[in-house]
């Protein structure tokens, strides 16, 4: 029995998976059912009757921390920590003996050719992507998408592989759009191929193996294979077969395999797509994928997910990945003690780190090191402190930094930097800025707890998010940032956040992170008075004002359309006739 089917049986027995037999449309309806269930911390869903396809669809497999922990039970949480300790320790025979299980895992790295195992796939007689139950998740999506694709490519110069998760849009029966990004492996491989005027072979796996999914999103160094990482975590090699008409290994752990190529120089409008930032990423030209063959298991199950505002499945699997990788950060970046990127902000928008300060401004050196490390280089706001704070409580992190931050030296802004493709707060696609907030050493100020001032012109409501951070409800028409910077009632507050809706912004840490850091760019939206320039930098003064209002150039928030909302509400008991515990 495959890994996926074992866990389907396990979760079904634990009432952590529900079979849905009612007919369900993959166009908006299925995604809305999924969203309601995951919001209520509900079970995984196996849809057996998806309109227009003979294949069942599995969603919400990663929808709770409990299920994620079970899915990765083969790889204990301390696995990477033990490897990091072994690498950084003086080698001793006794320690090697105690770590012999790790050596066994290392012997399991890589792929294994399935010489005697039956090939578990059948090939479609003709390529027709319409037979697959691709989801349209949001009303303004540009079409139907693969939402859990594992896209495999190899460098045409070094043959090093990459397994990445890039969304894939269906254009017609044999053509798709590849949302490759230049700063990630697949995009780099296509760039290399195009320099040689070659087409790039591409394989797309749809797999129920969670270790492949986790590895595909892992921010590994360019020369580290995601497949090797997956086999280390699962403690077993990946079986594969090669065919004469395609250069890539066909992984036995897949449910579907799409093989083809990305033609050199071919681009096509892709999107819009409601993404994991909670907004629509807009239509842009991206590479094409020409599908030449489709393989699938005879009893194939189509894995899918739905992304949007937090919390969705990407949040839980992203946090699991950080649990695994966190012991490696001090090994790769010796100045880092702990580091966390916040899934509530889409991960790349906000990162916080506890660092060492063993010499003058080592913390700055470490901050720059973080911003130069792989996918961490896409970080937009970086919060740095040398205090032992719980990074999973952002309000405590922010208070710790604001107690220590010296405005004339501890705010550093970099303009004209690379930006996450999905983040539209910069001047144009892939362009943005970065901001570093540093709070090092002993506290130098007491932070205000509550607002004691009067009404402020153009401000509808005022309340603190935490000590030292005040949120002001205003609008693009009413805001006057210059007057706020000079307002006497705000002088004691180090940080001011401008928000469209105060109560929704401060109702939870999740909402504060999402509404603040996905709606601003350091260079454009962080404002502060500066008394003078010295040594090629401005000397800032408090308060810092972050304008987190929705701007006209930003994409819209993803929202369910009324007809889909009504349809799902009316049909709820058809999906779940036994009235499960999650809400309607």
From Swiss-Prot:
Optimum pH is 7.5. One of its GO terms (cellular component) is cytoplasm. The enzyme activity is enhanced by Mg(2+), Fe(2+), Mn(2+) and Ca(2+). No stimulation is observed with Cu(2+) and Zn(2+). It holds the Pfam family UbiD. GO terms for molecular function: 4-hydroxybenzoate decarboxylase activity. It comes from the Bacteria. Signal peptide: none annotated. Keywords: Decarboxylase, Lyase. Optimum temperature is 30 degrees Celsius. It loses above 50% decarboxylase activity at 40 degrees Celsius for 5 minutes, and above 25% enzyme activity remains after incubation at 50 degrees Celsius for 5 minutes. It catalyses: 4-hydroxybenzoate + H(+) = phenol + CO2. Its EC number is 4.1.1.61. NCBIfam families: mena_SCO4490, UbiD family decarboxylase. Belongs to the UbiD family. Catalyzes the reversible decarboxylation of 4-hydroxybenzoate. Component of the decarboxylase complex composed of the subunits B and C (Potential). The subunit D usually found in other organisms seems to be absent. This is 4-hydroxybenzoate decarboxylase subunit C. It comes from Chlamydia pneumoniae.
């Amino acid at each position: 029995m495959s890994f996926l089917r074992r866990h389907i049986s396990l979760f079904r027995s634990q009432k952590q998976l529900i079979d849905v037999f009612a007919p369900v449309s993959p166009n908006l309806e299925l995604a809305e059912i999924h969203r309601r269930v995951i919001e209520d911390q509900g079970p995984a869903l196996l849809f057996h009757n998806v309109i227009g396809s003979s294949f069942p669809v599995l969603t919400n497999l990663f929808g709770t921390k409990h299920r994620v922990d079970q899915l990765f039970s083969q790889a204990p949480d301390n696995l990477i920590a033990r490897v990091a300790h072994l690498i950084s320790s003086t080698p001793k025979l006794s320690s090697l003996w105690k770590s012999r299980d790790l050596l066994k895992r290392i012997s399991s790295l890589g792929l294994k050719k399935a010489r005697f195992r039956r090939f578990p796939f059948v090939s479609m007689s003709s390529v027709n992507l319409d037979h697959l139950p691709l989801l349209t998740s949001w009303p303004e999506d540009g079409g139907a998408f693969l939402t859990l694709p594992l896209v495999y490519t190899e460098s045409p110069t070094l043959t090093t592989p990459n397994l990445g998760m890039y969304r894939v849009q269906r254009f017609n029966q044999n053509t798709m759009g590849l949302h490759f990004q230049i700063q990630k492996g697949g995009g780099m491989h296509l760039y290399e191929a195009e320099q040689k005027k070659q087409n790039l072979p591409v394989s797309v796996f749809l797999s129920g193996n969670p270790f492949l999914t986790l590895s595909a999103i892992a921010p590994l160094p360019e020369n580290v294979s995601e497949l090797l990482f997956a086999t280390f975590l699962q403690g077993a090699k990946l079986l594969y077969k090669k065919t004469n008409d395609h250069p890539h290994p066909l992984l036995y752990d897949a449910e579907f395999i799409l093989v083809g190529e990305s033609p050199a120089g071919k681009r096509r409008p892709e999107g819009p797509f409601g993404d994991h930032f909670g907004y629509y990423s807009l239509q842009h030209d991206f590479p094409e994928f020409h599908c030449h063959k489709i393989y699938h298991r005879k009893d194939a199950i189509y894995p899918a997910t739905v992304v949007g505002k937090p919390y969705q499945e990407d949040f839980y699997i992203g946090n699991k990945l950080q649990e695994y990788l966190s012991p490696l950060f001090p090994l790769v970046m010796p100045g880092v003690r702990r580091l966390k990127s916040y899934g509530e902000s889409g991960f790349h928008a906000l990162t916080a780190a506890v660092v060492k300060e063993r010499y003058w401004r080592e913390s700055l050196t470490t901050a720059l090191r973080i911003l130069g490390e792989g996918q961490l280089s896409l970080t937009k706001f970086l919060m740095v402190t040398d205090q032992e704070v719980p990074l999973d409580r952002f309000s405590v992190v922010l208070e710790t930094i604001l107690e220590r931050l010296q405005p004339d030296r501890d705010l550093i802004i970099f303009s004209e930097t690379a930006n996450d493709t999905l983040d539209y707060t910069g001047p144009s696609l892939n362009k943005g800025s970065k901001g570093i907030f540093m709070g090092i050493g002993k506290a130098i100020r007491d932070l205000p707890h509550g607002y004691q001032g009067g009404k402020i012109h153009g401000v509808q409501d005022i309340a603190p998010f935490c000590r030292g951070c005040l949120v002001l409800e205003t609008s693009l028409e009413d805001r006057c940032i210059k007057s706020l910077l000079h307002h006497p009632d705000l002088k004691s507050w180090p940080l001011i956040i401008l928000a469209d809706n105060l109560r929704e912004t401060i109702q939870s840490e999740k909402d504060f992170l999402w509404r603040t850091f996905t709606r601003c760019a350091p260079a454009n939206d962080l404002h502060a008075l500066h008394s003078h320039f010295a040594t090629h930098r401005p000397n800032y003064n408090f308060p810092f004002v972050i304008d987190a209002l929705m701007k006209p150039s930003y994409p819209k928030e993803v929202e369910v359309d009324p007809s889909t909302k009504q349809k799902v509400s009316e049909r709820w008991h058809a999906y779940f006739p036994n009235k499960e515990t999650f809400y309607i």
